[in-house]
Amino acid sequence: MPTQTPNRPSATKTSKIPTRAEKRPDEFIVVASDQGLGLNAPQEMGNKLWAPMFVMGVMAFAAALILGFVRSNAIATAAGAGTIAQLGHVTTGVMFIGFTAVLSAITFAIARILGVFRSEGGNVQTLASGHVQTLTMPAAAKGMILSMVMGMMAIIVAVGLHVYVAASVVGASEASLATAAQWGSSLEGVRRLGVGMHLFGIVLGLATIVHVLRFQSIRILEVAKERAASP
C-alpha cells in the first residue's frame, strides 16, 4: 500500500513588512500591514536614553551648584582674579551640560510617547480588524530630531570652548582676563542658540503628538465602522 505523507501545515503569510507609503484622502500618509510595526529607531532610542539623560542633567546641575559655591567663596576670600575667571567659565560649561541633557531627555521622552502610540495603536488595529495603517514619520518629528541634535552640538561646542578658555587663563594678567571676558560674552549667544534649538524641537515634538492623536481618533472610528459592517 502506498504510504500517505502527512499534510504539512502551510506557512502563514504575513505582511508585517510595510507596503509602499500612500496618502489617504484626509492627507495622512500611512503604510499598510496586517500587524503592528512596533517602534522605529528614534522611538527605540527614546525608550533607552530618556532616563539616563535626565539623570545626567540632574548630576550636572548638582556639580554646577557646587562649583558656584566654590566660586562665590573665592570671590568672598579675595582669591586671584584668574581663578575666579576660570571657575566662572567651568561653572557655566557644566551648567549647560545639564541644560542640554535635560532638554534632550524631554525630547527622548516625547519620542517614547510617540512610540507607545505607534505600537499600541498597531496592536489595537491588529486585534480589531487585521488591517493596520501606520503613520509614516511626519516632517515635524524629523525636525524635532534635527533640532535636538543641532542644539546639543551648539551647546557642546560652547562648553568645549568654555573649558579651553578656562585653561588658557594665565595668572591675573589683564590680557588673559580681558580675553576670558570677551569669550564669555561671545559664547553666551552660542549657548542661547543651542537652548533655543532644543526648545524648538520640543515644540515640534508636541505638534507631532497632536498630529498622531488626530490620526488615531479618525482611525478608531474607521475600525469601529469596519467591525459594525462585518457579518
Please annotate each region the language model reported.
Residues Q35-L39, N123-A140, S176-S186:
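Short membrane-interface loop/juxtamembrane segments of multi-pass integral membrane proteins
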Residues A63-G80, V157-S176:
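Membrane-helix interface motif
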Residues Q43-G46, G80-F96, L177-G194:
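Membrane-interface segments at the starts/ends of alpha-helical transmembrane spans
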Residues T107-A128, I202-P231:
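Cytosolic juxtamembrane helix at the C-terminal end of the final transmembrane segment
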Residues N40-V58, T136-M153:
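Alpha-helical transmembrane segments and their helix-start/interface "positive-inside/aromatic belt" motifs
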Residues V165-H211:
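Alpha-helical transmembrane segments and their immediate juxtamembrane interface regions
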Residues Q4, S129-L161, E222-P231:
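Hydrophobic alpha-helical transmembrane segments of integral membrane proteins
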Residues P2-Q35, E120-A128:
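Short, charged cytosolic
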